[in-house]
Amino acid sequence: MNGIGARRIGLLGGTFNPVHNGHLRAALEVAEFMALDELRLIPSARPPHRDAPQASAEQRLAMVRLAVADEPRLTVDDRELQRDKPSYTVDTLESVRAELAADDQLFLLLGWDAFCGLPSWHRWQELLDHCHLLVLQRPDADSEAPEALRDLLAARSVSDPLSLAGPGGQISFIWQTPLAISATQIRHLLATGRSARFLLPDAVLAYIQAHDLYRAPNA
């Protein structure tokens, strides 16, 4: 059982290069379905698994802040941008958990591909010491978890995400509305002079245009 007054906090990390409506819709759906007190978007500074982003950390942070400005359930956490070393999720979880009460619930949101890649993450076996994992699945997803995760799923998975109990330690899957939007797609549109409107918030698009981001080098 959860303690009376225990908070429910969600975390969604990413490069957000740029943040788009796919990120935002997934975050809002989870915040509503799970009755979270807060869902924090956490921009990564130097993601260990990706090349350096095209926009600066400060620009990506500014875009995320603009994107969630009118949605009180979504907030921005910039702690990973304060680091001068690669952003490891386990470090972020430890840092957030240290700020919460012992019975507060912490939920880490992961896409299916990220979840399947967990065995390559730094100290990945420790993630559940700090949080529950909420794996976002699209209705059209049809794949199995890698063998390295099957024992973990057998021991820790819960069929109903609303029944996740305690501050952490379990895994559940949650359906999300399939929005075929990607940051790569948006960057390509902008680099080729085409419109990205309705794929991301107008305020974010205005910021991109004002700062001349994602333009082709010879544009």
From Swiss-Prot:
A Pfam cross-reference name: CTP_transf_like
Q: Which GO terms describe its biological process?
A: NAD biosynthetic process
A GO molecular-function term, please? nicotinate-nucleotide adenylyltransferase activity
Instruction: Specify the superkingdom.
Output: Bacteria
**Species per Swiss-Prot/TrEMBL record:** Ectopseudomonas mendocina (strain ymp) (Pseudomonas mendocina)
In the UniProt record, does the keyword Cytoplasm occur?
A: no
Q: In which pathway does it act?
A: Cofactor biosynthesis; NAD(+) biosynthesis; deamido-NAD(+) from nicotinate D-ribonucleotide: step 1/1
Give the reactions, separated by semicolons, that this protein catalyses.
Answer: nicotinate beta-D-ribonucleotide + ATP + H(+) = deamido-NAD(+) + diphosphate
- Tell me which positions the record assigns to the signal sequence: none
Q: Which CDD domains match?
A: NMNAT
Keywords tagged on the record: ATP-binding, NAD, Nucleotide-binding, Nucleotidyltransferase, Pyridine nucleotide biosynthesis, Transferase
- This protein is called what? Probable nicotinate-nucleotide adenylyltransferase
